[in-house]
């Protein structure tokens, strides 16, 4: 006969060792990479070339099939390398951090914004690429209204 073990409110296991309770400061990297494969079904087209200077928030590439989906630079710096694979597929874009140029967007009060202005801000800021459409977890389309929104 088997014994059933029921645990309520978790279990406290007294084990030797454990993680240290010290918090350190993370080192800031000098190189950053954008990987188009992080965005499902995105077919990238480059907007910059190697050696170009980019600002934080400047579009680096966009989706060939949906030109309103832009992927922006996470830092300001210089495009160090565009790594390509078979058939010239873009594998990743390496950005070397240099300077602190930031593209700022004028965002008025949320109550004064129209639906079209909100969509335009999402497109220009590159935030649209991170809004997913169910059931296939693809990037949301701006021309289709969602039935519901999950946060």
Which sequence ranges carry the predicted segments?
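Mobile cofactor-carrier "swinging-arm" domains
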Residues: 1-15, 80, 85-87, 91-102
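N-terminal, Lys/Arg-enriched amphipathic/low-complexity engagement segments
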Residues: 1-47, 62
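Generic structural motif
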Residues: 38-42, 54-57, 66-81
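Acidic, glycine-anchored pre-beta loop/turn
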Residues: 48-54, 83-86
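Short hydrophobic beta/alpha edge segments that flank linear recognition/processing sites
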Residues: 54-68, 91-99
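Buried, small/hydrophobic-residue-enriched core segments of structured protein domains
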Residues: 85-151
